[in-house]
């Protein structure tokens, strides 16, 4: 390592009695080396077994919405068919997942739109989904009405945080009607929204498949809207220039084959 530091004419580690710590230059080098090593490992695993499916691993980044309404069933079927494959699942927002695809940390991402994807990354639409407005049981009376987005603004709102693509998406929907999205409660993850709705903290937009079980149990109520909320998509994002192992290719192809 000393030789490498001399060749690069820079310090990569700060050495102390407690161990070593990467310098900013070392962090940058580590990021590039990590991506190369993961690609090398994927190639090594593929070559070690011509079938590629008796062992190996697949690294996937998934948003919670994509995981809950699309990916879980695909992972279950894949694991039953190929139990020797190790699955590495990362909980990412859409931007985080796309960045991980770019850096080579994951084989591909399954996320919800909108997704900003630039070449050489490619995007495959897998499944459309509709989001609905829901509230807790104290809002039951609204279930027999039909609200405009302007009227929705009169009630407390729950949404994901402002740094998420979902927030930006709904902010653009409200702006298209001359309104500003100003939620009273911001959740860190999509899975937090439904419990917050049940606790009567406000109204929220949820994917219909995620809301359906609670609607059937009458734990929440759907509130009809006068204004149309555009359909969104679950999509798969991958790097067309990044080599995938056989297992990752198989899971990717299985996911694409199962698109709606």
Language model features with spans:
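Central regulatory/effector-binding core of bacterial HTH transcription factors
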Residues: 55-117, 187
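A short LG(V/I)-centered, amphipathic sequence patch enriched
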Residues: 5-22
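Secondary-structure junction motif
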Residues: 141-142, 156-177, 244-248, 252
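Hydrophobic hinge/microswitch elements
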Residues: 93-98, 102-105, 112, 166-223
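A late-sequence structural motif
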Residues: 70, 221-260
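Alpha-helical linker/hinge and terminal dimerization helices associated
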Residues: 7-8, 29-51
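Short loop->beta-strand "edge-of-pocket" segments that line small-molecule binding or catalytic clefts
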Residues: 59-61, 131, 147-167, 259
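Flexible hinge/capping segments at coil-to-helix
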Residues: 51, 120-157
């Amino acid at each position: 390592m000393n030789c490498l530091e001399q060749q690069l004419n820079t310090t990569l580690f700060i050495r102390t009695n407690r161990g070593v710590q990467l310098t900013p230059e070392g962090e940058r080098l580590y990021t590039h080396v990590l991506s190369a090593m993961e690609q090398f490992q994927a190639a090594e695993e593929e070559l070690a077994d011509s079938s590629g499916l008796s062992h190996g691993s697949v690294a996937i980044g998934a948003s919670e919405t994509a995981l809950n309404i699309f990916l879980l069933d695909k992972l279950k079927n894949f694991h039953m068919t190929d139990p020797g494959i190790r699955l590495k699942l990362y909980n990412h927002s859409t931007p985080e997942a796309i960045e991980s695809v770019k850096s080579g940390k994951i084989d591909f991402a399954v996320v919800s739109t909108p997704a900003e994807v630039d070449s050489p990354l490619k995007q495959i639409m897998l499944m459309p989904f509709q989001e609905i407005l829901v509230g807790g049981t104290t809002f039951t009376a609204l279930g027999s009405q039909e609200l405009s987005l302007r009227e929705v603004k009169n009630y407390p709102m729950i949404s994901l945080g402002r740094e998420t693509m979902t927030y930006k998406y709904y902010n653009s929907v409200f702006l298209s009607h001359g309104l500003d999205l100003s939620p009273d409660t911001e959740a860190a993850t999509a899975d937090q929204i439904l419990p917050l709705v049940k606790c009567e903290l406000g109204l929220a937009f949820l994917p219909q498949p995620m809301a359906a079980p609670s609607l059937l149990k009458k734990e929440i109520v759907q509130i009809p809207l006068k204004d149309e909320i555009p359909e969104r998509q679950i999509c798969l994002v991958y790097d067309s220039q990044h080599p995938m192992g056989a297992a990752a290719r198989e899971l990717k192809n299985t996911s694409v084959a199962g698109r709606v």
